[in-house]
């Protein structure tokens, strides 16, 4: 079968080696004669999977010992509610920085539980969309925390700065689309959360990193399944967890460690992004309207100069094994999501196709 490269924003491409191992173990895992999907989440075999996955994840991001790692349900949208329900405490307001679609979605959900102080960080610079630097973010004095999204998948906008607002500011961040793609200083955050379906594993799992002093503050109305303290006290098994997603994510963590960890991912992700943006920037046929300082390395939206060619581009690229390139309905055009599992070979195949498509239709 011809090589297929999946540029979907999520569920996203998984490492071929991981899929091969999962396929081999699907019906007979660990010599048990059953699938990992069929074993008890409280049995010693799966407990080992869970413990190894957490250890490997901690190793990859160098998570400090005073942070808890939770394996949860609910996705990023679940965390839009979980963060205020767990972290507000006796306060009624929180700072929210709006830099795109997902930040705005978090703000909308937070309004159910608190009064968000919203700072619009979006700006236009020389005709390109950009984000104001953190030094210009206006935070309030009485906020329980500050929330932002470092990578906007739909807009193709990234905020690569590391927060430095002082020890009294609890920073909560939605890392769903950029987790494990580069090193991060976890100690600068109070809460980090990430849906698994982009850089971690299959959909159905959400990972939360929470500083332990923030536990025990949950609103009385917080559903138990979203309560960080309850999840922590029950080793993320307050109810039956998504065991297969947990197992596969653990395999991805081992794949990452075997391939140089987040430092190596950082390097290759930069190479992939430079290759794709280079073709776009050196062409009048393609365009990207995000300022270079805020371009995402994970999600690259681009438009054709003649939108009438969009349908043909998508049809021909799909036939060439380049799948899921249609842009989000909010922005249109094309979008290539190039997460950790997307090899440089896949991006090279895309750029070769783009050059040839321009030659024939430009």
From Swiss-Prot:
**Where would one find the signal peptide in this protein?**
none
A GO BP entry is: pyridoxine biosynthetic process
Note on cofactor: Binds 1 pyridoxal phosphate per subunit.
| Cofactor names | pyridoxal 5'-phosphate
| Catalytic activity, EC | 2.6.1.52
InterPro entries annotated for this entry? Aminotrans_V_dom, Aminotrans_V_PyrdxlP_BS, Pser_aminoTfrase, PyrdxlP-dep_Trfase, PyrdxlP-dep_Trfase_major, PyrdxlP-dep_Trfase_small
What domain of life is recorded for the organism? Bacteria
Keyword annotations: Amino-acid biosynthesis, Aminotransferase, Cytoplasm, Pyridoxal phosphate, Pyridoxine biosynthesis, Serine biosynthesis, Transferase
Keyword Zinc attached: no
Where in this protein does the record say N6-(pyridoxal phosphate)lysine is found?
198
For the keyword Metal-binding, the answer is no
SS bonds (residue pairs)? none
Its GO CC terms?
cytoplasm
Residues that, per the record, bind pyridoxal 5'-phosphate: 76-77, 102, 153, 174, 197, 239-240
State where the protein is found: Cytoplasm
User: What PROSITE patterns does the record point to?
Assistant: AA_TRANSFER_CLASS_5
Its UniProt pathway annotation is: Amino-acid biosynthesis; L-serine biosynthesis; L-serine from 3-phospho-D-glycerate: step 2/3; Cofactor biosynthesis; pyridoxine 5'-phosphate biosynthesis; pyridoxine 5'-phosphate from D-erythrose 4-phosphate: step 3/5
Q: Which PANTHER family match?
A: PHOSPHOSERINE AMINOTRANSFERASE
Say what the protein does. Catalyzes the reversible conversion of 3-phosphohydroxypyruvate to phosphoserine and of 3-hydroxy-2-oxo-4-phosphonooxybutanoate to phosphohydroxythreonine.
The name under which this protein is listed is: Phosphoserine aminotransferase
User: Which species expresses this protein natively?
Assistant: Escherichia coli O127:H6 (strain E2348/69 / EPEC)
